[in-house]
């Protein structure tokens, strides 16, 4: 069968970097084709060219054998091509209904027919099996729910080609199951699908074949997933063999560095108490909605606590705002990198140095009022090299970097900060390739070996089991249990994560 969609010698150059170099391959109708590669390999750039966001510097796209050009995203949609980017394209202030029908709202005489729009939205969401309130504003939804809105929008446009870039990175288990069903239904309908994921289990479960990128070039093409093993995929992606992605390095933890006692906030069901020792990596696991990120934000001062105490190195401390936590040496790498972790319009150097107090020079009154540009450049170059951040230069806007390199820059920000005592890192490797994951784990081990207490939040259970010295499990807004590494099996952790909260009335009757 001839390819429905073809990439013919696609090249793209940005200042200082060649993102794509003469990439050619095709996709047939009724197939799911995987795209694999490390962060910065060029996968997302190719999808942005397909979706009309970027224009190629060389080569062409062909649909049914005819060359096409998409000057913008609207032209691509009109041609039946929908791209779901890793960075969501939704409007937070609008409702689910408004986002799904944006640009297509039914109207008469200049007025939107709200009743018809609402009925259509409810019917379509029910048809594809997604449980969302059409009236809910997206800013009040979780990242995973917003991702489902983006996916639904592409499906409801009846696109002939649908490209998905890391679609499950923010989804719950149930939402992932819904997505898998939708992808299989679309394949059965004869649509052509492109699927980018760093989760190799998903690639083997969904894709018929795959193409592998490395450094902007196509390095391998597999017609059938039966022709390749997981180990071969990883070796092709990173250009080297990775035997153990986690590379766990055992340590002997020291005294308790962070102790949380009876911490309570609006989104927790019960007061939370736990401790993290010097040189220890504690994994915090729970299903979506369990309260993991909410607990971290309370410790960090991003949300206001209603009760409880935070004790650091044996001394109770007062954290009323994020600045208080940072001054005490408690730092956070947030779950939502784009919205909370980076300043997209600023350079890599500025994002690394934004909290680095040692790069300030004293001004009037002895206050550190002035930025030492030379020292900032030196700091940025040091951590770009140390963490292997792929960027043409330190002044590159950070929004142009891949998700994995953005995460490394956020880590570099706190590595550059003197006096870090506690690192809270939320979803450290979400949307990140195998090679970059291994590098980030090594950084966490190095920090622990320096005596930093690390609290690692992750929804990926293998990551928790592979990296953590001890595991805390949350369920329904409370800490459901704690397991040492030797006892932390998938069965034991999930048993705690799925354990329902005991009804106080039932507990009283039992007593």
Swiss-Prot record:
PANTHER family in the cross-refs: ARABINOSE IMPORT ATP-BINDING PROTEIN ARAG, CARBOHYDRATE TRANSPORT ATP-BINDING PROTEIN MG119-RELATED
A GO cellular-component term linked to this record: plasma membrane
Keywords (A to Z) from UniProt: ATP-binding, Cell inner membrane, Cell membrane, Membrane, Nucleotide-binding, Repeat, Sugar transport, Translocase, Transport
Record-linked CDD domains: ABC_Carb_Monos_I, ABC_Carb_Monos_II
EC number from the UniProt entry: 7.5.2.12
Pfam annotation, one family: ABC_tran
SUPFAM superfamilies, per the entry: P-loop containing nucleoside triphosphate hydrolases
Record-given protein name: Arabinose import ATP-binding protein AraG
Gene this chain is encoded by: araG
Topology class, membrane: Peripheral membrane protein
Subunit (UniProt): The complex is composed of two ATP-binding proteins (AraG), two transmembrane proteins (AraH) and a solute-binding protein (AraF).
UniProt-recorded Gene Ontology molecular function terms: ABC-type L-arabinose transporter activity; ATP binding; ATP hydrolysis activity
Domain ABC transporter: 5-240, 240-501
Organism per entry: Ralstonia nicotianae (strain ATCC BAA-1114 / GMI1000)
Catalytic activity of the protein: L-arabinose(out) + ATP + H2O = L-arabinose(in) + ADP + phosphate + H(+)
NCBIfam families registered for this protein in UniProt: PRK11288.1
């Amino acid at each position: 069968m001839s390819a429905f969609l073809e990439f013919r010698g696609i090249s793209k150059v940005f200042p200082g970097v060649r993102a794509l170099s003469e990439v050619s391959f095709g996709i047939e109708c009724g197939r799911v084709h995987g795209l694999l590669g490390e962060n910065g390999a060029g996968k997302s750039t190719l999808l942005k060219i397909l979706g009309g966001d970027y224009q190629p510097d060389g080569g062409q796209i062909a649909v049914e054998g005819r060359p096409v050009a998409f000057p913008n995203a609207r032209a691509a949609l009109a041609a039946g091509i929908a791209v779901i980017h890793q960075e969501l394209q939704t409007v937070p202030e609008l409702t689910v209904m408004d986002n799904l029908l944006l640009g297509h709202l039914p109207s008469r005489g200049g007025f939107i027919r709200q009743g018809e729009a609402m009925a259509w939205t409810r019917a379509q969401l029910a048809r594809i099996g997604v449980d969302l309130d059409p009236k809910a504003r997206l800013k009040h939804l979780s990242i995973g729910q917003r991702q489902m809105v983006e996916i639904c929008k592409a499906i409801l446009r009846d696109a002939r080609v649908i490209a998905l870039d890391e679609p499950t990175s923010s989804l719950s288990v149930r939402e992932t199951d819904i997505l898998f069903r939708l992808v299989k239904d679309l394949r059965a309908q004869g649509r052509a699908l492109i699927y980018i994921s760093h989760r190799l289990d998903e690639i083997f479960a969904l894709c018929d074949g795959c193409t592998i990128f490395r450094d902007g070039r196509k390095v391998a093409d597999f017609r059938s997933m039966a022709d390749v093993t997981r180990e071969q995929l990883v070796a092709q992606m990173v250009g080297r063999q990775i035997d153990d992605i986690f590379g766990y390095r055992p340590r002997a933890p020291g005294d308790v560095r962070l102790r949380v006692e009876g911490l309570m906030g609006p989104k927790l069901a019960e007061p939370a108490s736990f401790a993290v020792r010097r040189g220890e990596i504690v994994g915090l696991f729970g299903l979506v909605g369990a309260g993991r990120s909410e607990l971290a934000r309370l410790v960090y001062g991003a949300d206001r606590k209603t009760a409880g105490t935070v004790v650091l190195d044996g001394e109770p401390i007062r954290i009323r705002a994020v600045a208080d936590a940072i001054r005490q040496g408690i730092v956070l790498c947030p779950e939502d990198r784009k919205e909370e972790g980076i300043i997209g319009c600023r350079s890599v150097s500025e994002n690394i140095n934004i909290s680095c107090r040692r790069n300030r020079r004293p001004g009037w009154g002895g206050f550190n009022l002035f930025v030492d540009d030379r020292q900032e450049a030196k700091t940025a170059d040091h951590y770009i090299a140390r963490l292997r951040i792929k960027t043409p230069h330190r002044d590159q806007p950070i929004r142009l970097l891949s998700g994995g390199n953005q995460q490394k820059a956020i880590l570099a920000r706190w590595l550059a900060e003197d006096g870090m005592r506690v690192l809270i890192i939320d979803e450290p490797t979400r949307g990140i390739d195998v090679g970059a994951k291994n590098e980030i784990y090594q950084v966490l081990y190095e920090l622990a070996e320096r005596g930093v207490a690390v609290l690692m939040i992750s929804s990926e259970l293998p990551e928790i089991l592979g990296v953590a010295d001890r595991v805390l499990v949350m369920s329904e807004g409370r800490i459901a249990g704690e397991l040492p590494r030797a006892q932390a099996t998938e069965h034991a952790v999930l048993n705690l994560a799925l354990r329902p909260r005991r009804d106080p009335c039932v507990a009283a009757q039992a007593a």
